[in-house]
Regions:
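N-terminal Sec-pathway targeting helices
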Residues: 1-17
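Membrane-interface motif at the C-terminal end of an N-terminal transmembrane signal
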Residues: 16-34
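Proline/glycine-enriched tight loop/beta-turn segments at coil->beta junctions
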Residues: 38-45
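Serine-dependent carboxylesterase/thioesterase catalytic core
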Residues: 47-50, 57, 66, 73-76, ...
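The serine-hydrolase catalytic nucleophile loop
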Residues: 55-61
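Short aromatic-enriched loop/helix-cap "lid" or pocket-rim segments at secondary-structure transitions
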Residues: 60, 87-88, 158-164, 209-214, ...
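Histidine-bearing beta->alpha loop at or near hydrolase active sites
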Residues: 78-83, 240-244
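C-terminal catalytic-base region of ester-bond hydrolases, centering on the histidine
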Residues: 193-256
Length: 256
């Protein structure tokens, strides 16, 4: 019996160690901001940011394409495993938006003198990033807000967050996961429908059959298509793309 408990203790300890290493080396990414066309703002500003466990690399294809089209692009890579969604937004997203709004206001004053139309700020965000921008826009009003594009958004949560295992592993996967449960009282389901120009893009193909087994209905490997929808926001399915491969398709950029 003692031998059994020793083995069990070793297994539990090893599991915790593995989970801790996964969190530190695979799920945790540093805060950084990347600018495109920063000193040559002749078109609108587009702010982009990732979803949970994501990096700026995932949005690089979109960022570079938009920059090639002349937009001033600002990508925010932020840590996603330490805070809840509201805290992440206030800590990492708000300061950059404030920075860009201040810059845009100055530019628009100069353009007004020249009788040029005002420039706007748009947002292109992936997955959980949609929850951050919806929370931000619920709490703040932007006078020069343009288009908001939500890619693969868990607009009404995901069954993956409902799984009891997610509650047990909250320390390792991050407290923000609980914000994306599908029950009506969850954080994401308290954000309401957008009152601004908002579009939803989502894939229709899964590359993770284990996750798909936990999700009801058609999904993109992470998010159910049915719960991505938002009232009043047009939805476009990008065919043959998954939760992440959708970010590397020219069709996605064309829809933005």
């Amino acid at each position: 019996m003692k031998k059994f408990f020793k083995i069990l203790f070793f297994i539990v300890l090893l599991t915790i160690l593995i989970l801790w290493l996964v969190k530190i080396f695979l799920l945790t990414h540093k805060y950084q901001v990347k600018y495109y066309n920063e000193d040559k703002i002749e078109k609108d500003i587009v702010i982009t940011f990732n979803g949970i466990y994501g990096t700026e690399k995932q949005l690089r294809f979109i960022d570079e394409k938009l920059a090639e089209d002349g937009y001033s692009v600002v990508n925010i890579q932020y840590p996603t495993v330490d805070d809840k969604i509201a805290e992440m937004t206030d800590k990492y997203i708000v300061p950059i938006i404030d920075e860009q709004v201040k810059k845009l206001n100055k530019i628009n004053l100069e353009r007004k003198v020249k009788n040029l139309p005002e420039l706007k700020i748009h947002f292109v965000v992936h997955s959980m990033g949609s929850c951050l921008i919806r929370y931000y826009l619920k709490e703040h009003k932007l006078d020069n807000l343009g288009k908001v594009v939500l890619i693969s958004p868990p607009s009404h949560g995901s069954q993956l967050a409902d799984n009891p295992i997610a509650d047990l592993l909250w320390y390792f996967i991050g407290p923000a996961v609980a914000d994306m449960k599908t029950d009506k009282d969850s954080f994401v389901n308290q954000l309401g429908n957008p009152t601004y120009l908002c579009y939803v893009l989502i894939g229709d193909k899964s590359n993770n059959f284990l996750y798909s087994m936990l999700i009801k209905g058609e999904d993109d490997g992470m998010v159910p298509l049915a719960t991505a929808k938002l009232n009043g926001s047009p939805l476009k399915t990008i065919k043959n793309t998954t939760h992440t491969s959708i970010l590397e398709k020219q069709e996605t950029v064309d829809e933005i």
